[in-house]
Amino acid sequence: MAVITIGGVTKDYAVGTTYEQIAQEYQEQYNNTIALVTENGKIRELHKKVSKDADVKFITLSDTIGHKTYERSAIMLFVKAVHDIMGKDVRIKVEFSIGKGLYCAIQGDKKLDDNSIKLINKRMNDMVAADLPITKKPYP
């Protein structure tokens, strides 16, 4: 068991419990979706597991870091969908933000058309529905 302190309240959790499971217990206390946690001051993704006693704080989508994490996840989802539909030889450049959106340029031999846009949108929705995790992989 690990002792987890959240907002001054301590509770025992089994080692191996994910921060997502813990966040689900507290989500109703927050106006915005919990996106990340800090474990003893270090940012952790929700799929990470409890391994030791820790002081935990929740980061929501209304927090700057939570919003940036959400934005990066949306970009990765978009890039994956474009590559799945148009091929990996297509290059995607995230140029700048426009209001609450992002301007992205797709470069390569293949041209973007209405059908490609529909297929990319469908692929993104399918991946969201499948609840596929986004995981980090270290590269040398």
Q: At which residue positions do the language-model features occur?
A:
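Eukaryote-biased recognition of intrinsically disordered, low-complexity regulatory segments
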Residues: 1-10
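N-terminal catalytic cores of NTP/NDP-binding nucleotidyl/phosphoryl-transfer enzymes
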Residues: 15-19, 58-87
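Short amphipathic, charge-patterned alpha-helical segments
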Residues: 17-29
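Divalent metal-coordination and catalytic microenvironments
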Residues: 23, 76, 104
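Short acidic beta-strand-loop surface patches of small beta-rich interaction domains
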Residues: 33-48
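Loop/turn positions that initiate beta-strands
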Residues: 52-56
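Non-catalytic interaction/regulatory segments
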Residues: 98, 107-140
